[in-house]
């Protein structure tokens, strides 16, 4: 669809945009109103209008005939006060229009306009540019060399600081003085990131009733500085300070939240943000350019998607317009981020809004050229136009939120309408009827195409279908069978032995920094990472979904390392993951040291094997059982055959991750150890989850954790999978024993020989393999090679007797609705029975 056709089909808004050109486009008015630029009226105590000699002098945004100089003096300006278009580069920085082609590889016809919106670091003449959220950088001429508090802060000398603070009269005077960077001692400490020093100064402020909300000449408070420069721990010291005012704005009308949303870098942004909310922050405050915190969050290069989602959850208005008539959606389109565009549209962003460039977001996306953004916005407009054609456009957002676009209308059924929240029977019938019309039209079109190309025959209709190989282990998911590991043998492993380290078997005892220096090619610059979604948390830290060099990754952010033992844990996991390369292990991309310790790994979209087994919609059969058990055993074998040998020590279904292609991979090596003389002490400690812990380790008498301890854990995961396949639902190990209620009871009973009980109709070969793996005597447990050999033999047995094996599976009641009677001469089959299945089968659904 071209631009002109797009514009011509969009209906007018019910509410016109004040001071902005209105659209004649076809998307509906939304419940949220379009806000024009109305600067926030939040508290701004004692905000001085005196010029402040910083690099962020306030300049009026105006069309210029002569460029603005670095001192903030404009050679010539018109009397009109407007801000310029805000194109976006790949770093998320507002740029001038002259650089739009550089940022987006597309030409720009808009005139270059001087503005105060986010331009620093884009041009080489950085001193002549300043951001509406840029803090003080250039020094003043005054020098407070006699200020002992400033000297202590600069030297990060906590002892000298305490000594000076012990003299309240002098300290109060010095705390109010500015240094050569025109900052108070508190602001200097905030910029330096000195947690203990900040805490001491704040305690002095509180004890002496000093004003924590005191503003400098440009209106900045300590909270502005902290929100822009500090990590989560220091920022929360300010936010938790009694009497802190989170809504004070500076001369550019930016609140601390504007800075926080644009500049905060830590993935732990939820905690400080929640304190902002508790303090009554205005999430819709607009600065002088009309930008809200939601606008600003688009420019956060590290946690932008996390920020956007938090703001939307907190009630941020998605259709607030800045002085250029642009909403946050325009910013996301310029950035070329389909994920951001999707989140904003699903939150109700109106794609028909036209900014000063007279373009809707879809038209703007065509000039930017990002195909994924273009496709998404076109899908949104197409589904709306179709719903409008049947007078049901009020449901367009229901469809968009579930990503039910035109290509999936053919598969809509009653259950899909339930998931869309469409309850009115007349509307449901109308949608189903019109979807059937679309289906018949497609069949007719296909038939005519076949006749034209000679693929059809007279009097008959031939529909071309795409056949996808599926496994019985996935039911209706239509997941392509993984052919890499369905028939692996010991011989193939011998021909491709695992790699080995070049070391002599000893592990370096150097500190973390030296370890990373030795593996410096694994060190990742934190600026190359972006966090997009929190996936979970555990005892060792939090895990986020993110982006690294444009690739989806998982980022494991470790908790602060305060002890030597924690340092050793990180070093071991880093060394192990940096040493091993195997298709059966989660790929390791590298680690970051600052500002947070984190490890960057392959992202496995289906979560852990534990979560896969707990998801009832997944029909896990014997094919999937053999695939998973083979892959996990090959992963453990890779560890056991390494030089020096590695034992996992925490093998369980939660530490087996499943990617989009249904490949099961071993992960989480935080407890893993190289099996060397240096690690004898740690190998004798009880580690791992109790149900998966072998009895010799559970006894706690100092027995070494060996490779056979890992084999025991493999046996317990085998039990989980066998039980899930046969019973059709997940059960926890030992859950059949009513007398076992506590974890320690599992350990006591396992050392007495008690084991989880397999279903009665378990195939004898699988039962024998399970019992070998969990044998009380570790020397009688099989090796990984023996397990693989047995699995290959049992899989061959299954392939030869599929009917017999499948008859052992207990059939659960069908979740599908009963078949509807056929009312037409043409029978149409839909392979999707739910919205989730529709989304999973975009490329696999065929109608015959």
UniProtKB/Swiss-Prot annotation:
Residues 529-799 form the Protein kinase domain. GO terms for biological process: signal transduction. Residues 378-441 form the SAM domain. Coiled coil: none annotated. Its EC number is 2.7.11.1. Signal peptide: none annotated. Transmembrane segments: none annotated. It catalyses: L-seryl-[protein] + ATP = O-phospho-L-seryl-[protein] + ADP + H(+); L-threonyl-[protein] + ATP = O-phospho-L-threonyl-[protein] + ADP + H(+). CDD domains: SAM_superfamily (cd09487), STKc_MAP3K-like (cd13999). Keywords: ANK repeat, ATP-binding, Kinase, Nucleotide-binding, Repeat, Serine/threonine-protein kinase, Transferase. The active site is at residue 650. SMART domains: ANK, SAM. Disulfide bonds: none annotated. Residues 1-52, 60-85, 95-116, 452-472, 822-848 have a biased composition (Low complexity). GO terms for molecular function: ATP binding; protein serine kinase activity; protein serine/threonine kinase activity. The keyword Repeat applies. ANK repeats lie at residues 181-212, 218-248, 252-285, 289-320, 324-353. ATP binds at residues 535-543, 556. One of its GO terms (cellular component) is cytoplasm. The keyword Nucleus does not apply. It comes from the Eukaryota. Belongs to the protein kinase superfamily. TKL Ser/Thr protein kinase family. This is Probable serine/threonine-protein kinase DDB_G0278535.
């Amino acid at each position: 669809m071209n631009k002109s056709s797009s514009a011509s089909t969009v209906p007018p808004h019910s509410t016109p945009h004040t001071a902005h050109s209105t659209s004649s486009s076809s998307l509906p008015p939304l419940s949220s109103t379009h806000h024009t630029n109305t600067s926030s009226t939040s508290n701004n105590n004692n905000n001085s209008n005196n010029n402040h000699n910083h690099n962020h002098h306030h300049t009026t945004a105006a069309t210029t005939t002569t460029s603005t100089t670095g001192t903030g003096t404009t050679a010539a300006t018109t009397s009109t006060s407007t801000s310029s278009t805000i194109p976006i580069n790949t770093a998320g920085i507002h740029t001038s229009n002259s650089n739009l082609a550089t940022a987006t590889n597309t030409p720009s016809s808009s005139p270059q306009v001087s503005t105060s919106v986010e331009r620093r670091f884009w041009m080489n003449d950085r001193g002549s540019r300043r951001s509406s959220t840029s803090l003080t950088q250039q020094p003043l001429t005054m020098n407070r060399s006699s200020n002992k508090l400033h000297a202590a802060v600069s030297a990060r000398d906590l002892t000298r600081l305490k000594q000076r603070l012990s003299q309240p009269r002098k300290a109060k005077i010095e705390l109010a003085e500015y240094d050569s960077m025109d900052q108070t001692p508190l602001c200097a400490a905030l910029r330096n990131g000195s947690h203990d020093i900040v805490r001491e100064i704040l305690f002095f402020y509180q004890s002496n009733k000093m004003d924590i909300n005191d503003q400098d000449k440009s209106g900045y408070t300590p909270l502005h500085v902290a929100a822009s420069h500090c990590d989560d721990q220091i920022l929360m010291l300010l936010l938790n300070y009694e009497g802190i005012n989170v809504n004070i704005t500076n001369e550019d009308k930016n609140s601390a939240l504007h800075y926080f949303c644009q500049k905060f870098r830590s993935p732990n942004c939820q905690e400080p943000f929640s304190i902002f909310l508790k303090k009554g922050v205005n999430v819709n405050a607009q600065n002088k350019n009309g930008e809200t915190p939601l606008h600003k969050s688009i420019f956060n290069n590290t946690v932008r998607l996390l920020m956007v989602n938090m703001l939307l959850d907190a009630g941020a208005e998605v259709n607030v317009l800045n002085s250029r008539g642009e909403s946050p959606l325009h910013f996301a389109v310029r950035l070329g981020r389909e994920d951001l565009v999707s989140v904003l549209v699903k939150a109700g962003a109106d794609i028909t809004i036209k900014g000063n460039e007279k373009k809707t977001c879809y038209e703007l996306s065509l000039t930017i050229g990002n195909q994924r953004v273009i496709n998404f916005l076109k899908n949104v407009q197409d589904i709306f136009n179709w719903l409008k054609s049947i007078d049901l456009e009020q449901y367009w957002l229901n469809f968009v939120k579930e990503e039910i676009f035109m290509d999936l209308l053919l598969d809509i059924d009653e259950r899909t309408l339930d998931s869309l929240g469409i309850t009115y029977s007349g509307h449901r019938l109308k949608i189903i009827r019109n979807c059937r019309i679309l289906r018949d039209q497609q069949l007719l079109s296909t038939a005519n195409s076949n006749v034209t190309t000679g693929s059809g025959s007279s009097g008959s209709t031939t529909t071309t279908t795409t056949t996808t190989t599926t496994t019985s282990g996935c039911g209706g998911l239509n997941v392509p069978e993984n052919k890499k590991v369905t028939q692996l043998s010991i011989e193939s492993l011998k021909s491709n032995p695992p790699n080995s380290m070049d070391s002599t078997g000893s592990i370096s005892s150097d500190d973390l920094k030296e370890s990373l220096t030795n593996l410096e090619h694994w060190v990742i610059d934190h600026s190359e990472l972006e966090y997009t979604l929190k996936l979970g948390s555990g005892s060792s830290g939090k895990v986020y979904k993110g982006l690294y060099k444009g690739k989806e990754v998982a980022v494991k952010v470790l908790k602060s390392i305060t002890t030597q033992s924690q340092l050793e844990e990180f070093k071991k996991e880093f060394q192990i993951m940096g040493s091993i390369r195997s298709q059966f292990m989660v790929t390791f991309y590298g680690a970051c040291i600052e500002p947070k310790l984190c490890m960057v790994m392959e992202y496995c979209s289906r979560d852990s094997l534990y979560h896969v087994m707990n998801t009832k919609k997944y029909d896990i059969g014997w094919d999937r059982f053999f695939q998973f058990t083979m892959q996990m055993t090959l992963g453990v074998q890779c560890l056991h055959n390494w030089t020096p040998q590695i034992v996992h020590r925490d093998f369980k279904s939660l530490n087996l991750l499943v990617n989009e292609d249904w490949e099961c991979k071993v992960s989480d090596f935080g407890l893993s150890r190289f099996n060397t003389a240096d690690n004898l002490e740690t190998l004798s400690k009880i580690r791992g989850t109790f149900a998966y812990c072998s009895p010799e380790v559970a006894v706690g008498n100092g027995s070494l954790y060996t490779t056979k301890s890992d084999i025991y854990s493999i046996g317990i995961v085998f039990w989980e999978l066998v039980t899930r396949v046969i019973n059709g639902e997940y059960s926890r190990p030992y859950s059949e024993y009513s007398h076992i209620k506590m974890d320690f009871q599992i350990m006591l009973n396992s050392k007495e020989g008690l084991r989880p009980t397999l279903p009665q109709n378990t195939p004898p070969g699988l039962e024998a393999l399970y019992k070998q793996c969990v044998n009380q005597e570790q020397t009688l447990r099989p090796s990984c090679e023996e397990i693989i050999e047995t699995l290959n033999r049992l899989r061959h047995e299954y392939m030869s007797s599929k009917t017999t094996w499948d008859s052992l599976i207990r059939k659960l009641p069908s979740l599908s609705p009963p078949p509807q009677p056929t009312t037409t001469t043409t029978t149409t089959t839909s392979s999707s029975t739910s919205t989730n299945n529709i989304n999973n089968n975009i490329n696999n659904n065929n109608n015959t």
